[in-house]
Amino acid sequence: SGNLYEAISVSCNNQSTSVDSKIETEEELIKRALEIHKRVLTLDTHADTPLRMIEPGFDMAERHDPNETGSKVDYPRMKEGDLDAIFFAAFVAQDIRDDNGNSRAKALCVQMIDSIVNSTKKNSDIVGLALNPDDAYDLEKEGKRAIYIGIENGYPIGKDLSNVKLYYNKGVRYITLVHSSNNDLADSATDSKGPEHGGISYFGSKVVNEMNR
């Protein structure tokens, strides 16, 4: 691995290649792509793996057969694929928006976040929790995979702004405001009931400001 700039440079240089340049074969393209892949820092910005991590007996340090478990990511396959860093998303599907629903969503979200953190501690010889961009490069130099944490769907925030800080302190570094249905933060383009807030809600704007603080 190396620097993302190299991949960008290669891409830009290719755009200016003259039409009479040698056309690469598929084999040559794959070879060059693999060379770039090995040279740059590679990052997967979204994986729903935490849904697996809270299942009894699921171990991220073991290589899983996707045909048997449905698992698409684990630490051995991250190494095999030269994937340097990944965002594990704690996903909570949208449900009832009342105190009980918000409480259940928060509890499930915290459970997934804790499972990610515990997994990085248990496997600290091969992975590490990353909290900023530099951490990925530092962990790469140590021969470790960088594990970032995100939240998919702002539902676990409920109506409590202080939850943003709670999740941040636990290691979360991004939150997608909404998923397949409207919530208290914003409208979803796929909600069958149509828009509720006209986009982002007033509370959703406060959440964004808090995340950027």
Model-flagged regions — what are they?
Residues 1-7:
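Sec-dependent bacterial lipoprotein signal peptides
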Residues 195-213:
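Alpha-helix-loop-beta-strand connector modules within alpha/beta enzyme cores
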Residues 2, 12-198:
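N-terminal hydrophobic targeting/anchoring segments and the immediately downstream early-domain regions
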